[in-house]
Amino acid sequence: MRKLIIEPLTKEAFAPFGDVIETDGSDHFMINNGSTMRFHRLAEVQTAQPDDKAIISIFRAEALPMPLTIGMLERHPQGSQAFIPLLGNPFLIVVAPVGDAPESELTRAFVSNGRQGVNYHRGVWHHPVLTIEKRDDFLVVDRSGEGNNCDEHYFAESQLLVLDPNPLEG
């Protein structure tokens, strides 16, 4: 099994998979008579059909035991999906490029600093939300509409990956 190297989450490194949602280094302008700084258009919600709706949900995630064997990734072919941490905790991100199936050797792992969210572009393979904390809440922006919007791919045993965040503690 290949051990995933956990990279810091940056806009440049994550660009092939989607958007990093953060205020650091982002364009902004003042609104509300100068009392509010608006960080505008940090990501775009992607939908496939004219009748699709962008919806907002909250996911409450439970931590999985680590190290974690990554045996499955999912994708949303009908729309993007964004995760914004609500409690300020770092979280893990596992992604693979758009394609008919995720390629184990192209799969990458990132860690958010807790002030960064991610917006997976339509069709990007990713692991379901991975909190480091025992329990964590995320604001989720994704698509509601007709048709299947979640494909799952299970890796063959020879393609399994290992995610171990413990080096972050040292």
UniProtKB/Swiss-Prot annotation:
Its EC number is 4.3.2.3. One of its GO terms (molecular function) is ureidoglycolate lyase activity. One of its GO terms (biological process) is purine nucleobase catabolic process. Pathway: Nitrogen metabolism; (S)-allantoin degradation. Its cofactor is Ni(2+). It catalyses: (S)-ureidoglycolate = urea + glyoxylate. Keywords: Lyase, Purine metabolism. It comes from the Bacteria. SUPFAM superfamilies: RmlC-like cupins. Homodimer. Catalyzes the catabolism of the allantoin degradation intermediate (S)-ureidoglycolate, generating urea and glyoxylate. Involved in the utilization of allantoin as nitrogen source. HAMAP family: Ureidogly_lyase (MF_00616). Belongs to the ureidoglycolate lyase family. This is Ureidoglycolate lyase. It comes from Pseudomonas savastanoi pv. phaseolicola (strain 1448A / Race 6). The lineage of its organism: Bacteria, Pseudomonadati, Pseudomonadota, Gammaproteobacteria, Pseudomonadales.
